[in-house]
């Protein structure tokens, strides 16, 4: 019964957008546990009272949740004493692994000194001031002028839209308000950031997306490249489509374009060659701002301090979160270029104040932990470590790409996804009820490794502190789980015949 329910849950995330096919729209199933392993029917589980994010209702009544009690380095330990290699670093975020003593000390010291003070009305604490300076110094792809603090990446992206609107209103352009995002990208789950997310499941039954949000092509060459179309030609076509969309809507109405350097939660999709070069040319032509969502790619994930460094992105605004504090405490940030921050400054003087903020904006404990995290990234040269170790990770996993059940393995740095496909074709998915990725995830879990299952894919984004030995162990478990999954798929194929 649970397997049927789980298939229905995965299927509920299917849907179509302008750029998604029947197969690609299957991606955003967010259940990471397998009913084959976690079913608690008949064992006395009474359910729980938490309305859990991205979780089907029946999970809270039929499935005992995986309860993680502690972490150490790249590993987490559940309530039953099982040890797992956490290949998603929580939710793409515990970059420095579990229980880093320097971060714990930074939090404790700040809690003892000043557990909270706000940043309203020209009052603040020292940690947010210091952190803002550090972030402006650290982000070098383009000069930034100011930093606004939030509590999450969702809030950061939400705030970006408000800043863009405020900016255009100040310049006397009240109609320049539309935001263009990519189909299949994920930007958060607030009202605005969920609208920006190009995933049907984020919109279904929520009356989203908001009418001011438009979506353009997903830059996934393997899935959407035309027969005989080179990667650079694919990028040109997508840039042309973006330009046509801007012209159709009217450049005077389009305010900004938002993109991750590498699409993360929407499927781990690195951009095709020349993509951002061509996209930025279009944006500059029509005076459209570029918001770089670096929530996942920031602080070394791709082997550079920021994804913008790797892909030569020159954004006007930047969103940060997750690894900003290695997820030890909630914090996000928006970086704003001087061209925009100067206008915001001037407009706020005319109005009387900048009327946007949160109680916890620049929380001193969060900022103190983030400051220590930034010190560690620099002192240990985490981007260089990722650059050194990521070939072992990428090549180790991609060595299995010839498997008959793998359609594509893609990634960069310590960010990777494997997409399962029948006959290795992007247009020939496995039947939903087979739950191929779920089977793989369950086999990994049996062997002491957690991966994220996303529809027909599994995703990995391990802690940036992983050792070569841990990478080798990850690759070994991946291979064993793949072999077991191939055997199960062979059984399912034979039954289907």
Curated annotation (Swiss-Prot):
Signal peptide (UniProt feature, chain positions): none
Binding site for substrate: 186, 322
GO cellular component, one term: mitochondrion
Pfam families xref list: Aminotran_3 (PF00202)
InterPro entries membership: Aminotrans_3, Aminotrans_3_PPA_site, PyrdxlP-dep_Trfase, PyrdxlP-dep_Trfase_major, PyrdxlP-dep_Trfase_small
CDD domains attached to this UniProt entry: OAT_like
Main location: mitochondrion
Catalytic activity: 4-aminobutanoate + pyruvate = succinate semialdehyde + L-alanine; 4-aminobutanoate + glyoxylate = succinate semialdehyde + glycine
SUPFAM superfamilies per the UniProt record, alphabetical: PLP-dependent transferases (SSF53383)
A GO BP entry: biotin biosynthetic process
Location in the cell: Mitochondrion
Domain of life, per lineage: Eukaryota
The EC number(s) this enzyme carries: 2.6.1.96
Top-level class of the enzyme under EC nomenclature: transferase
Function according to Swiss-Prot or TrEMBL: Transaminase that degrades gamma-amino butyric acid (GABA).
Name of the protein in question: Probable gamma-aminobutyrate transaminase 2, mitochondrial
Species for this entry: Oryza sativa subsp. indica
